Design a protein with these regions (language model features):
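Conserved SAM-binding loop
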Residues: 12, 45, 153-154
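Iron-sulfur cluster-binding cysteine motifs and their immediate structural context
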Residues: 2-4, 9, 15-37, 47-64
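Short, charged amphipathic alpha-helical surface segments
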Residues: 41-42
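Iron-sulfur-associated redox domains of electron-transfer enzymes in respiratory
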Residues: 54, 60-183
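Glycine-centered flexibility motif
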Residues: 12, 32-34, 84-85, 99
Length: 183
């Protein structure tokens, strides 16, 4: 079995699926691990999947602009959130200032990512999600908005942020928030 990265080392960011134009990659998901399996019949050996995989190509180490901790001042936001509501406050502020936000939400029994510029829709992003999530086509959706000159905030796990940075060619209007990973 040929895989994008070393067997049982796949973080499940799914960027390789978004990048592959030949639909040659399937994610094999078992209880503990993901594996990005390459269909060698469909694969044309372009190497794009490996170029964006954060386990194969490390993202350039950049010092954070700043490092903060805190909580929402709004008691309603704080009480609805799992960890003080800081992510919700950042998300709502970003949208109110004309940006789009991509983050994980529960939709029809599945944890998926969505891109929105609606604070009402962004309410679905609230809460900790200590589960595997499926970014599906979020990297493509974000890249389209960035190409349109829109500002986009991505809130996700470090592996997903790294995958997005490897995937995106237009990072001038890309903002990211890495959440602590418990996986």
């Amino acid at each position: 079995m040929k895989t994008v990265c070393a067997k049982d080392m796949c973080a499940g960011c799914m960027a390789c699926i978004n990048m592959c134009k030949k639909s040659a990659i399937t994610i094999v998901d078992d209880y503990k691990t993901y594996n990005a399996v390459i269909d060698e019949v469909k694969c044309v050996n372009c190497g794009l999947c490996e170029k964006i995989c954060p386990n194969v190509k490390c993202v350039e180490q950049v010092n954070p602009i700043f490092w903060k901790e805190g909580w929402a001042l709004n008691p309603e936001i704080r009480s609805n959130a799992s960890s003080g509501g800081i992510a919700s406050s950042i998300i709502y502020s970003f949208i109110k200032n004309g940006g789009y936000v991509a983050s994980c939400m529960l939709n029809k029994g599945e944890f998926v990512f969505e891109l929105t510029n609606s604070t009402q829709r962004a309410e679905q992003f609230v809460g900790s999600k200590y589960v595997k999530s499926n970014p599906k086509t979020i990297y493509i959706d974000i890249e389209r908005k960035l190409q349109e000159g829109k500002k986009v905030l991505f809130v996700g796990l470090p592996c997903q942020v790294a995958a997005l940075k490897n995937f995106s060619r237009n990072q001038d209007n890309l903002y990211t928030v890495d959440l602590i990973c418990h996986g």
